[in-house]
């Protein structure tokens, strides 16, 4: 890894009226992203012509990085998560109204509603082949769906032979490894669980956190899992062996984790900053903070992270409704 690489603020995306909860970027690097928010909507952003302005005045506000051209509405409560299909045609959202929705991005319309959770949906994911959908909720269950909106399996509650989580399931992800089809989940019961996708049976229970788990992320090759939450530590797990590899101390509550698609970096959104770890040295190579400092009562912090597919751009959603866009040096950035 080039030791000199760093991230600089390239601009902002403004359009949400409440906290940004999730950001999804297409895997083919198309110039758009989709974000979800507590304003009960999703926004589709055009980033075809991002600002390349470099500020000469460090006090100047960062430039607008793109424009929202479609607002997706229909959920009756906070939209907590959003992901994209691999072809970039559809967005999938989960909401505190207890439903998932599949959206046709060409029309902005809901094409499918997924009804079955009895409490707030906190996390959603698409399988690599887009044929399966997984969701996690405050009803302590994980549900596996087909794209027709039919629930094929429920883990937890009265289902799953007592293997399910005993607290809110805050985050769920598919492993991208086709040789080991698995689902990884994190919960407020302080555990991370790995499930066999073929039969929805528990494969491994990963324990080590001292507080609730907010976020899990799986590395691009499917070999590693990172988890984080209330205790302010990120645990790195070997998914094949089912064992903890090491800890990284973030020092504050972790709300989101994501691996860089093409560098050995792990990013954590905490209540203090966005931390970028170099996993080779296991050191924080950068601490990203917003260009404005909020009053303590406002608690301005990052809630959600997503990398562009080419690894050049980090999108970070904040409690103030703004998405801040950070560029890896060499890809053009905005000096602050």
Swiss-Prot record:
Keywords: Repeat, Ribonucleoprotein, Ribosomal protein, Transducer, WD repeat. GO terms for biological process: negative regulation of translational frameshifting; rescue of stalled ribosome; signal transduction. The keyword NADP does not apply. GO terms for molecular function: protein kinase C binding; ribosome binding; translation regulator activity. InterPro entries: G-protein_beta_WD-40_rep, RACK1-like, WD40/YVTN_repeat-like_dom_sf, WD40_repeat_CS, WD40_repeat_dom_sf, WD40_rpt. WD repeats lie at residues 15-55, 74-113, 116-155, 164-205, 208-247, 249-287, 297-336. GO terms for cellular component: cytosol; nucleus; ribonucleoprotein complex; ribosome. Component of the RACK1 regulatory proteins that play a role in multiple signal transduction pathways. Belongs to the WD repeat G protein beta family. Ribosomal protein RACK1 subfamily. Homodimer and heterodimer with RACK1A. PANTHER family: RECEPTOR FOR ACTIVATED PROTEIN KINASE C RACK1. This is Small ribosomal subunit protein RACK1y. It comes from Oryza sativa subsp. japonica (Rice). The gene is RACK1B.
């Amino acid at each position: 890894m080039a030791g000199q690489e760093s991230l600089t603020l390239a601009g902002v995306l403004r359009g949400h009226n409440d906290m940004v909860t999730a950001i999804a970027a297409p895997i083919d690097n198309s110039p758009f992203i989709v974000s979800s928010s507590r304003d009960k909507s999703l926004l589709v952003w055009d980033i075809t012509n991002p600002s390349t302005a470099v500020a000469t005045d460090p006090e100047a506000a960062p430039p607008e990085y793109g424009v929202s051209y479609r607002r997706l509405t229909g959920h009756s409560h906070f939209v907590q998560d959003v992901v994209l299909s691999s072809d970039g045609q559809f967005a999938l959202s989960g909401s505190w109204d207890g439903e998932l929705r599949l959206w046709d991005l060409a029309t902005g319309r809901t094409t499918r509603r997924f009804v079955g959770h009895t409490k707030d949906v906190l996390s959603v994911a698409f399988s690599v082949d887009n044929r399966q959908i997984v969701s996690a909720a405050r009803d302590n269950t994980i549900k596996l769906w087909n794209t027709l909106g039919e629930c094929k399996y429920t883990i937890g509650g009265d289902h799953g032979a007592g293997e399910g989580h005993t607290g809110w399931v805050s985050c769920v992800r598919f492993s991208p490894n086709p040789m080991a089809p698995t689902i990884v989940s994190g919960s407020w019961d302080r555990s991370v669980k790995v499930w066999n996708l073929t039969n929805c049976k528990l494969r491994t229970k990963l324990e080590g956190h001292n507080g609730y788990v907010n976020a899990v992320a799986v590395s691009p090759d499917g070999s590693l899992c990172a988890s984080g939450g209330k205790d302010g530590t990120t645990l790195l797990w070997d998914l094949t062996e089912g064992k903890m590899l090491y800890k990284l101390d973030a020092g504050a509550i972790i709300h989101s984790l994501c691996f860089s698609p093409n560098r050995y970096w792990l990013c954590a959104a905490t209540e203090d900053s966005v931390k970028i770890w170099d996993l080779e040295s296991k050191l924080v190579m950068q601490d990203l903070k917003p260009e404005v400092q909020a009053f303590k009562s406002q608690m301005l912090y990052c809630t959600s992270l997503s990398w562009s597919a080419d690894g050049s751009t980090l999108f970070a959603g904040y409690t103030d409704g703004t998405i801040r866009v950070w560029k890896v040096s060499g890809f053009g950035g905005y000096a602050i």
